Amino acid sequence: MLRSHAAGSLRSSDAGQQVTLAGWVARRRDHGGVIFIDLRDASGITQVVFRDPDVLKQAHRLRAEFCVAVTGLVEIRPEGNANPEIATGDIEVNASSLTVLGESAPLPFQLDEPAGEELRLKYRYLDLRRDAPASAIRLRSKVNAAAREVLDRHDFVEIETPTITRSTPEGARDFLVPARLHPGSFYALPQSPQLFKQLLMVAGMERYYQIARCYRDEDFRADRQPEFTQLDMEMSFVDAEDVIAISEEILAALWALIGYDIPRPIPRISYADAMARYGSDKPDLRFGLELVECSEFFKDTTFRVFQAPYVGAVVMPGGASQPRRTLDGWQEWAKQRGAKGLAYVLVGEDGELGGPVAKNLSEAERAGLAGHVGAAPGDCIFFAAGPAKPSRALLGAARSEIAHRLGLIDPQAWAFVWVVDPPLFEPADDATAAGDVAVGSGAWTAVHHAFTAPKPGYEDAIETDTGNVLADAYDIVCNGNEIGGGSIRIHRRDIQERVFAVMGLDHAEAQEKFGFLLEAFTFGAPPHGGIAFGWDRINALLSRVDSIREVIAFPKTGGGVDPLTDAPAPITEQQRKESGIDVKPEPSKPH
């Protein structure tokens, strides 16, 4: 070993020992005839002092981030010089020898000062020398170990599934890989291990897990990565309660790493309730401000804007005092979200209603409105009217915006909730508008994925009442972030084919794309279900950072670019020729 001790491990009890340390020069201070450096390694920092004339001469050439090895005697710092801010603050190492292991060029940014994200990612190997980014990566390793410990205790088997496979429609675009030995044909990087983990259940593995790399060629959205990680699990002979129970045990083990005890059982809310009360299928329950249904209240209104299939409201406490320019700003805020605006009524301190909407209301509506929505004098009532889904989504976004503006969210709080019983299908146009890829060519597509089982009792309504079929599915939400989602799966070929048909996949197309799965279901497939946790998002929450990029060792930018390696990059003509990327496949011959 090039060193005898870790820099952060030395204490006053080590005084008198000769040690050899190795690490980086975090800071250098020249005090005339004495030079001090803060020597940093993965364990922490120790102050090294150079007094010996021969070693002092060498130390003059040290600069920030030189990699060095130092041998010397551990000494108690002189009285008054202790540093209580660091664990090694009572001691210093009096150097008797110095070896420069690697010099450093001038730094592109100072490691103890803020730097722009693109510069940080371009020099990520320097960024990770900082304490906060390094701590996030190290915590992630502990998170992996904690999850594995729980799963191993419950007899799960860790199995690796393929990372180059067949392109199958799963709700997003595939990254495609040309197959050089099969010109004109392509592999795909998996969007998830979904099909393989179901096949592992057919294979009798019974309990599978994997910390899986997944790939989705999505339009770039804020805080998304083209490659991401999920903790993937699947179990045979279970119902939703079994999957939820093991999931809660895993989450409790993870949050215990940061000293938080998750109250269990985690509360549940139906998808329908979440949308009606919070305007979101991933509600943040750290604050109240529930939406209020007003459709019945305004059923006889003469105000044309409120003559809509849905009218709802959310109250902003104290919002009546907002100046006109702020209220106008809310209209721009709503328009940026695709709405025409955000109607509002101001409740005066005397209880009188003001604002442009109030004068369009009947006397009875004005008299009863504040009581109906729970508004007090001085509050502002925001409204949305129109189709229920987009109107509730707008109010849900307004609810979150109000909470942020009023400081209603305790940043130290944790609020977990299961969202259960979502619809199995949604209109394909809605999925496309949200940036997803509809699996088939039908009017309906799957809300989660095409392999989710309908809730018991809904099987007969798949074709006849498609929009009202509920899924046997469950999402786990933390502080308004969906951190995991799962379901009981279809394990019968006939039901799977019916679901495909509703989504516009005819028998031939289903056979072409999913024939291997359908065939597997004919060999005694067990009932099974599972869940996948968004590992990057969970780690970001545990490290209390805003972006998942902070918990990924070498992330891409929001635009999918890696500033470090300058990927993606063009390929050469030779690579293009060898890959067969331009070869058109021969038409399939009829059997």
Curated annotation (Swiss-Prot):
* Disulphide linkage map: none
Main localization, broad class = cytoplasm
* Aspartate, as annotated region: 194-197
According to its UniProt entry, what is the function of this protein? Answer: Aspartyl-tRNA synthetase with relaxed tRNA specificity since it is able to aspartylate not only its cognate tRNA(Asp) but also tRNA(Asn). Reaction proceeds in two steps: L-aspartate is first activated by ATP to form Asp-AMP and then transferred to the acceptor end of tRNA(Asp/Asn).
Could you tell me which PANTHER family the record lists for this protein?
A: ASPARTATE--TRNA LIGASE, MITOCHONDRIAL, ASPARTYL/LYSYL-TRNA SYNTHETASE
Which E.C. number(s) belong to this protein?
6.1.1.23
GO BP term, example: aspartyl-tRNA aminoacylation
- Record's family? Belongs to the class-II aminoacyl-tRNA synthetase family. Type 1 subfamily.
Q: Which regions are flagged for Basic and acidic residues bias?
A: 574-591
* Name of this chain's protein: Aspartate--tRNA(Asp/Asn) ligase
Gene3D superfamilies annotated for this entry?
Bira Bifunctional Protein, Domain 2, GAD-like domain, Nucleic acid-binding proteins
What chemistry does it catalyse, as a reaction equation?
tRNA(Asx) + L-aspartate + ATP = L-aspartyl-tRNA(Asx) + AMP + diphosphate
Q: Which CDD domains match?
A: AspRS_core, EcAspRS_like_N
Please give the residue ranges the record annotates as the region Disordered: 559-591
Alphabetically sorted, this entry's keywords are:
Aminoacyl-tRNA synthetase, ATP-binding, Cytoplasm, Ligase, Nucleotide-binding, Protein biosynthesis
NCBIfam families xref list: aspS_bact (TIGR00459), PRK00476.1 (NF001750)
Q: Decide whether keyword Cytoplasm is in the record.
A: yes
Which cellular compartments is it found in? Cytoplasm
Report the Pfam families cross-referenced here.
GAD, tRNA-synt_2, tRNA_anti-codon
